[in-house]
Amino acid sequence: MTVEPARAPSLYAALAAGRPVDVEVSGVAADSLGARRVGEIAFAMATASPPISLLVDDEEILRARDLMWRDYRIAAEAGAATAYAALTGGAYRPEPNERVALIVCGANTDPATLR
């Protein structure tokens, strides 16, 4: 499964078009997840099995980043909080007894912005 910011949807748009396409990029996670076009190799890997591609908005990303700080003391950048935003915002709802793992990486956050 992939999760992207709604304002930087390079894979989501490529899946909809059936091929990599250029997209406009902006938003809180653009500096880390703001590829204008998904690469050919990434697109091929994403389409090798039935893809699930989700979008989350900036407000959900910032809320998830703040929750990660408040609940776990993880100082994540917006891009790293995007997958967590899908879980906390409801874009992704795990099946009963499903195990979900998130990889959180990135060091591009200003601690002064954490709430």
Describe the role of every protein-language-model region.
Residues M1-A48, G89, R93-R115:
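Glycine-rich phosphate/pyrophosphate-binding loop at beta-loop-alpha junctions
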Residues G39-N97:
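Active-site-adjacent helical/loop segments in soluble small-molecule enzymes
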